[in-house]
Swiss-Prot record:
InterPro entries reported for this sequence: Ribosomal_Su5_D2-typ_SF, Ribosomal_uS9, Ribosomal_uS9_bac/plastid, Ribosomal_uS9_CS, Ribsml_uS5_D2-typ_fold_subgr
Listed GO biological process terms: translation
Disulfide bonds: none
Keywords: Ribonucleoprotein, Ribosomal protein
GO molecular function per UniProt: RNA binding; structural constituent of ribosome
Family: Belongs to the universal ribosomal protein uS9 family.
Name of the protein: Small ribosomal subunit protein uS9
Pfam families (alphabetical): Ribosomal_S9
Primary gene name: rpsI
Keyword Kinase: no
Length: 128
């Protein structure tokens, strides 16, 4: 099987996922994903597309991810892996879509407005 690639995005994170048949290693920016993502919820999030379609341990996945924080990066990788699995077998699309793993989360950080402390929070108001 040749190398398949897919892109996942979340907030400002962009993950380029390269999937090929192998023993099941997931490498993120040159590190094992369990070293890169230290908390268990993030590790489970990254592995969830593979576990859902029972393909864990069948593919070697190499990921280049940049931008954002760890949660955004983990969710970008999750989307990229799900998209790559659909390229392998189109039958995976419906269970992945049903679990919401094929949908790009389009929520972005709202910009800060002038005259306010943050995007919506106002400066302290003094009545007297």
């Amino acid at each position: 099987m040749e190398v398949l690639n897919a892109i996942g995005r979340r907030k400002t994170s962009v993950a380029r996922v390269y999937l090929q048949s192998g023993k099941g290693s997931i490498v993120v920016n040159g590190l094992d994903f369990k070293t890169y993502f230290k908390t268990e919820p993030l590790q489970i999030s990254v592995e969830s597309p593979l576990n859902l379609v029972a393909e864990a341990g069948k593919y070697d996945i190499n990921v280049n991810v940049q931008g954002g924080g760890v949660t955004g990066q983990a969710e970008a990788i999750r989307l990229g892996i799900a998209r790559a699995l659909v390229l392998v077998n189109s039958e995976f699309k419906s269970p992945l879509r049903k679990e919401g793993l094929m949908t790009r989360d389009s929520r972005m950080v709202e910009r800060k407005k002038y005259g306010k402390r943050k995007a919506r929070k106002r400066f302290q108001f003094s009545k007297r």
